[in-house]
Amino acid sequence: LAASPSEIWSASISGSTNRARLAAAPVVAGGKLYVIDADARILAFDAKTGARLWQTQMPSEGNGRSLFGGGVSALGDKIFATTGVGDVAAINAANGTILWKKQPGGPLRGSPTLANGHVYVMSQDNQIYALDQLTGETQWSDAGTVQSTGVFGVAAPAAGQGTVIAGFSSGELTGYRYENGRDLWGDALSRTN
């Protein structure tokens, strides 16, 4: 990074409001930059020039809930996105076509984790879901202890070496077998005052 970086390009996307919060980081893959905005639109830009390549609106049945959260991840020729109303979608990275869209459970806050042929997502109500990357069908799910209050963001699950690790807002940390969600281990992390 240069001592005095200069702006190469910028783009305007829908930002935060009282009913929608923009908290997702952009993702760069294959020479493109992908981002989800506060209105649940996924946008693709040329990473070098900033030219908008496409945008796709994530349709949602919604029920008046706010669009707090969501995120994007990229793998191969697909983008995977989550929204604050609980949608998970696979999107064609070349043209923005939605390949599948599912609602596995409650509001989703963080970006999806992509590994082992699955899309792993965490919900605000302490659920982890493993969806098939090709079909979007739920392969397994599990729940942490439900909390009456929580933080705005939820950490994405970590995945590696055949294990998926979920950190829940209750302080629980659980390791799962990626293919079936079997608990491998768990621990409760204490809160600090």
PLM regions and their residue ranges:
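Short loop/turn segments that connect beta-strands within beta-propeller blades
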Residues: D46-T49, N92-N95, D132-G136, R177-G181
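Structural recognition of beta-strand segments within beta-rich domains
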Residues: N18-L22, V28, Y34-D37, L43-F45
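Beta-propeller domains
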Residues: D37-Q57
